[in-house]
Amino acid sequence: MLAKRIIPCLDVRDGRVVKGINFEGLRDAGSILEQARFYNNELADELVFLDISASLESRRTTLEEVMKVSEEVFIPLTVGGGISSVERAREVFLHGADKVSVNTAAVNDPYLISRIAEKYGSQAVVVAIDIKKVGNHYMVHTHSGKQITQYEALEWALKVQELGAGEILLTSMDRDGTKEGYENNSLRMISTAVHIPVIASGGAGNLEHLYDGFSKGCADAALAASIFHFRHYSIRQAKEYLHKRGVAVRF
């Protein structure tokens, strides 16, 4: 059985880690480097660094910040935000990222996924999918959740898999920052339909929510921010809890 992964996420804006609710109302959650060092020492399986305003503001992720984080951590580092070309992905890799996450740019130019995957391998390409329930449909949103697209979540997930994505980071905008648990219906729908790993994101408020993301949502990994940033739980506590409940995790 493949071990399930626990992945803290650094949402970065203006050089600081921030956290909001439903993609709004951001509050400060500490220093980028302090949080990165903490998670590197905390048994995190990977670390995600998302410049959450890069696409919205039509700018690029700060490479200097990426490099500083990569020098501090010895776990896989995924970087996203404003990556809209193979050349930009190359720069991010050269500054220490192990994977790149594309979101808005992939919706605007789906074959960007293929171009990056062909050059660096599918394992290096994470497609972040931000979804919100509209009526009875889960719709994909871009530009930090500000713009709705024509894609339904499952349709887009299958498409990015076909184009060469190695992993999907699925965030429920409805649950983001609420601490009410992952949106396991959409998570299960997509996890069981694709053959690439799916990372659950948006809503983790306690350790049972992590367990539910794996058991009910069929996720391959669980991403969380608030519960770890503000030290409600440690990564070790999360893994010990999951292990006791029969979930395979790495220590």
Swiss-Prot record:
Catalysed reactions, semicolon-separated: 5-[(5-phospho-1-deoxy-D-ribulos-1-ylimino)methylamino]-1-(5-phospho-beta-D-ribosyl)imidazole-4-carboxamide + L-glutamine = D-erythro-1-(imidazol-4-yl)glycerol 3-phosphate + 5-amino-1-(5-phospho-beta-D-ribosyl)imidazole-4-carboxamide + L-glutamate + H(+)
A GO biological-process term: L-histidine biosynthetic process
Signal sequence bounds: none
Keyword Signal in record: no
One Pfam family hit: His_biosynth
Protein's pathway: Amino-acid biosynthesis; L-histidine biosynthesis; L-histidine from 5-phospho-alpha-D-ribose 1-diphosphate: step 5/9
Compartment(s) of residence: Cytoplasm
InterPro entries, per the entry: Aldolase_TIM (IPR013785), His_biosynth (IPR006062), HisF (IPR004651), IGPS_HisA/HisF (IPR050064), RibuloseP-bd_barrel (IPR011060)
Catalytic machinery residues: D11, D130
Membrane spanning stretches: none
Principal location listed in the UniProt entry: cytoplasm
Cellular component terms (Gene Ontology): cytoplasm
UniProt entry keywords in alphabetical sequence: Amino-acid biosynthesis, Cytoplasm, Histidine biosynthesis, Lyase
EC number assigned by the record: 4.3.2.10
GO molecular function: imidazoleglycerol-phosphate synthase activity; lyase activity
Stated family: Belongs to the HisA/HisF family.
Protein's job: IGPS catalyzes the conversion of PRFAR and glutamine to IGP, AICAR and glutamate. The HisF subunit catalyzes the cyclization activity that produces IGP and AICAR from PRFAR using the ammonia provided by the HisH subunit.
Cited NCBIfam families: hisF
Designated name of the protein: Imidazole glycerol phosphate synthase subunit HisF
